[in-house]
Amino acid sequence: MWKKLTTYLTLISTLLVCSMFFCSFASIIGPEGSTVKIMYYEKMPYLVMMIMLLTGGLFSILTHRLPFLQARVCMLTGLMLIGFQIWLGVDFFNYRNDMVFSLTMMFPLLAATLEMIASRRALVDGVTLQALKLSKRNAGVMSSKTK
């Protein structure tokens, strides 16, 4: 499981999404200089999206023995992360004058990049495994023909 780069990339991506549960989304500066932090989990749509992304990342890690399925799950998770990033960007442009946003808003973009790279690596692993199986089968056929 821990021998493939795909697993590490997906794990880092999943940890980035998981860290968003503990980070603040934005801060609102009050009239007397007091700040109110808004966490990601306080907004229900963000919470649902992060749970879906966390589930996708964990499922991708656990499907390490099936590289084609892992590639599909990584690609789907990456696309969901891009959608989440667009959603965060829309909120940023809507509330940029009222709130001070956290740098953690860029985590989905970084995680999406890692997921896309992991998807590509999983496809390469799958094709390599298929080629290895095919070459072993052809080697067995060739050795039986020479006898």
Question: PLM features: what roles do these ranges have?
Answer:
Residues V73-V90:
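Hydrophobic alpha-helical membrane segments
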Residues L15-K43:
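Hydrophobic transmembrane helix segments
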Residues L58-A71:
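Juxtamembrane helix-break-helix junctions at the cytosolic face
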Residues K37-T55:
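Interfacial helix-start motif at the membrane-water boundary
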Residues A118-M142:
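Cytosolic juxtamembrane helix at the C-terminal end of the final transmembrane segment
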Residues M99-G126:
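Alpha-helical membrane-associated segments of multi-pass integral membrane proteins
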Residues M1-M20:
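Cytosolic juxtamembrane helix and N-cap/initiation of the first transmembrane helix
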